[in-house]
């Protein structure tokens, strides 16, 4: 990313901090950035720094890797995410998906992350941007009570941990209709999820089909 784009992102960050850059205007700005520069540009916009060191990975979790901006844009558009939604990111990392999704949609956002250094960084980012509707908690998603209308997973778990997380999400689906969004993770074998179409080849969408009257 060249210096002109970096300066543009920093100028836009001031508008985000002031609460004046949101929604469609922000979306048009992000889409105007060349594809290969889009991820680092958004990180500069949001003030996301390189990830801090994290301790050894618990069994069933995977190393931190941020989700691509285009997958986030597709998720916001395809769900579609609205101001009355609550988006929950399981394995939320430094917060790129949640912060960008909130700025674009106005939805309340909540992240669950097992690595405390990443949680501290994500909280500091939201504080700097004055975003009170985006929160993060240090917790094991497979052991947490969950709630929300939209769930996002960027391949954060595998094996038995993933199975436990899916059961936690199913418990929410038994109370309310939800949408589950995944990147790099297929859940087509989960009986209570109905696959939906997606505009991005890496993004999978599912609607819950749990009998909430049984």
Task: Please give the residue ranges for each predicted region.
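Conserved SAM-binding loop
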Residues: 122-123
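Glycine-rich SAM-binding Motif I of class I
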Residues: 95-99
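S-adenosyl-L-methionine
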Residues: 1-82
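Conserved SAM-binding motif I beta-strand of class I
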Residues: 108-113
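C-terminal substrate-binding/active-site "lid" region of AdoMet-derived donor-dependent transferases
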Residues: 160-210
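Conserved class I S-adenosyl-L-methionine
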Residues: 84-93
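A short SAM/SAH-binding and catalytic strip from SAM-dependent methyltransferases
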Residues: 149-162
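Conserved SAM-binding strand-loop segment of SAM-dependent methyltransferases
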Residues: 130-139
């Amino acid at each position: 990313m060249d210096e002109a784009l970096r300066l543009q992102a920093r100028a836009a960050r001031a508008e985000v901090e002031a609460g004046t850059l949101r929604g469609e205007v922000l979306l048009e700005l992000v889409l105007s950035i060349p594809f290969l520069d889009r991820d680092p540009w958004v990180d500069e916009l949001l003030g996301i720094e390189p990830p801090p060191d994290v301790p050894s990975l618990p069994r069933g979790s995977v190393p931190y890797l941020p989700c691509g901006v285009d997958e986030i844009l597709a998720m916001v558009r395809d769900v579609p995410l609205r101001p009355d939604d609550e988006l929950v990111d399981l394995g939320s990392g430094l917060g790129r998906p949640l912060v960008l999704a909130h700025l674009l949609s106005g939805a309340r956002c909540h992240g669950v992350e097992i690595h405390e250094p990443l949680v501290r960084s994500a909280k500091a980012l939201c504080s700097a941007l004055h975003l009170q509707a985006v929160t993060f908690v240090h917790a094991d998603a497979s052991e947490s009570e969950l709630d929300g209308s939209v769930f996002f997973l960027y391949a954060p778990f595998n094996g038995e941990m993933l199975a436990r997380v899916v059961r936690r999400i199913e418990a929410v689906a038994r109370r309310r209709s939800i949408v589950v969004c995944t990147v790099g993770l297929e859940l087509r074998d989960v009986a209570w999820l109905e696959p939906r179409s997606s505009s991005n080849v890496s993004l999978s969408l599912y609607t819950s089909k749990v009998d909430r009257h049984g």
